[in-house]
Amino acid sequence: MKGNIKALILALSAFTCVASAQSINIEVLSATVKDKKIDDATVILQKNGAQSVTARSDAAGRAALNAPFSVDQDSLLIIKKEGYSDLVVKCPCDGMTYAVSPVMKSLDGMRIVLTWGEKPFDLDSHLIYPGNHVYFSHKKGRDANLDVDDTDSFGPETITIDKKRLGESYIYAVHDYSNGDKANSLALSASSAKVFVYVGSSQVRSYSVPLNKTGNIWTVFRLNPNGDFEDINAVGEADFSKAKDGNALPMVLNPAQTAVSVTGNTALAKSLNRDGEAAYGRGELEQATTLFLAAIDQDSAFGQAYSNLGLAYQKRGNIAEAIWANRKAIALANGSNAATTRASSYYNIAKIYENAGQFSDALQHYELARSQKSNTVYDKAIERMNAKK
């Protein structure tokens, strides 16, 4: 009798494992070359408390993973390839196409990559900044261009900014071209659209389209004049036919372009940040960076996480990313030490520019540092930059 019961328990356990197992199939493409398949990319599926599953993409860019766990919103997919930025995305991810971004060399560059599901067939990326509107009908703007345009599901659509200009605002939005005349459509909200933002060799932000919202335009984020991200992440309606150029488009986007607070899990963010500090202390810089970014995903106003992230980036030699993190620290500075924090961050950015030989940019940021706080170090740096003109 006991033997029969034991056999039954083993059978049920085996059935449970099979039932919870899940097969995940994805495709990996280049973010900058249309339809280029990426082979030999390492694809990792992770979930807390479970053993990671790893696969490699084949010549067609396809990768299949058999997960011994249920793949849900608590699961992470990570794609790694030499010469490309790591891609990190929350699941569900089965049947999706992901595009990896080649490492960028510009200190002031940025790449924005859009992917989505099978429907709608055509989503379009739009980048709007003073005097410029980069999209499918106008693929090149000042220091920015549409690298890849996709009209038959999945994406990617990629916009690269070669040089962000301090003092100018940039708005990035996604238009549901397939349902462009249907302001009450739910198709965009149900598209599984995701936006990935890259600086240097790192993915620094990611966004998922809000669910159960009607509209044909997803206004994702704004880069403010200081170069800081302002999360908008709102779905609404817009008539892009009225936008003949970049000067007209803000009028079209006006109902949706006000930055909103993005809710997150503050307690989880603090926990992830502590884990990141521990990893940093052990010298595990890659893991620390991942944890600090995860903390920021949970709380986009977490200043300490950005400060820690900047240190990790600098230690790893990720200079462009260090600039981005310092800009965010400037934006979040508050309290009695705010001026000191801003001055220090401007100085850090200036030193990076000076070391790269970008002396006019360095001078501008040394002057910004001095505008926040008097310091003979800043005075001498300004003299040094003026002598190089």
State where each predicted segment sits.
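Alpha-helical segment of the N-proximal tetratricopeptide repeat
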Residues: S261-Q298
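Short, acidic Ser/Thr/Gly-rich low-complexity loop/linker segments typical of extracellular
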Residues: G49-L65, D150-T151
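Intrinsic-disorder/low-complexity signal
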Residues: S101-T263
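Structural motif
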Residues: Q22-T42, T115-K119
